[in-house]
Amino acid sequence: MLLHIPNVLNAEQLRIVRERLDTAGDAWVDGRATAGYQGAPVKRNQQIAEHTPIARELGDVILASIERNPLFISSVLPNQVYPPLFNRYEGGMQFGSHVDGAVRVLPNGVKLRTDVSVTLFISDPADYDGGELVIEDTYGVQQVKLPAGDMIVYPATSLHQVTPVTRGVRVASFFWVQSLVRSDTQRAMLFDMDTAIQRLNATNADDAARRSLVGIYHNLLRTWSEP
């Protein structure tokens, strides 16, 4: 399931994040430092070094926002979230076609299975040319270039790339989530059911039928989840 989540960061949060990243200086390093053997040969960008104070500070802003975002919670069903990272593309930089690694290691040494990949756009799309996130999924090729503050979530199993940035600078945050539900198909079904339940809650739908659907949702989540 590929889902656009709007307005994850508000204007004030974006201003703070941009100002901190614009003045990050030597915290920006070669992005290949965090790439696996498959990604390194096709990766040309810069990243904020992992586990640095600025990465933790700005990552906490994003984590606090997604924890309060009902659309993110409903669609991703997060169990563990990898600390957000930050990247920058300019002057022809790109990231060729690749699949994200299956496992990441958290700062405390715990391994995280990457079920869902997340990109949060920090630059406004008018500020750069190119830089589309191109995702290949079961419905074909999707080109994604969202307003600043908006987020795209998609299965980490997807082949994807970032096209060359030919003008301006593209800055984004990216991270991975281990979901309570490993299967993308099952997550999508639960999301659709939860969305339908929320719509019923806003109407005068039969209360007994609504309670029955809520029970089915939680029983499916109980069956499929891996806490």
Curated annotation (Swiss-Prot):
Q: What InterPro entries does the annotation carry?
A: Oxoglu/Fe-dep_dioxygenase_dom, PKHD_C, PKHD_hydroxylase, Pro_4_hyd_alph, Pro_4_hyd_alph_FE2OG_OXY
In terms of Gene3D superfamilies, this protein maps to: q2cbj1_9rhob like domain, Rabenosyn, Rab binding domain
The alphabetized UniProt keywords are: Dioxygenase, Iron, Metal-binding, Oxidoreductase, Vitamin C
Question: Where do the annotations place Fe cation binding?
Answer: 98, 100, 160
What is its EC class?
Answer: oxidoreductase
Protein's UniProt keywords contain Chaperone: no
Give GO terms for biological process. Answer: DNA damage response; intracellular iron ion homeostasis
Which cofactor does this sequence's record say it needs? Fe(2+); L-ascorbate
Q: Identify the residues that the record assigns to the Fe2OG dioxygenase domain, covering every copy.
A: 80-179
Region forming the signal peptide:
none
Q: How is the cofactor bound?
A: Binds 1 Fe(2+) ion per subunit.
Give the EC number(s) under which this enzyme is classified. Answer: 1.14.11.-
> Residues that bind 2-oxoglutarate, according to the entry?
170
Provide a Gene Ontology MF annotation, just one: L-ascorbic acid binding
- Which protein, by its recorded name, is this? PKHD-type hydroxylase Bxeno_B2756
Q: Which organism is it from?
A: Paraburkholderia xenovorans (strain LB400)
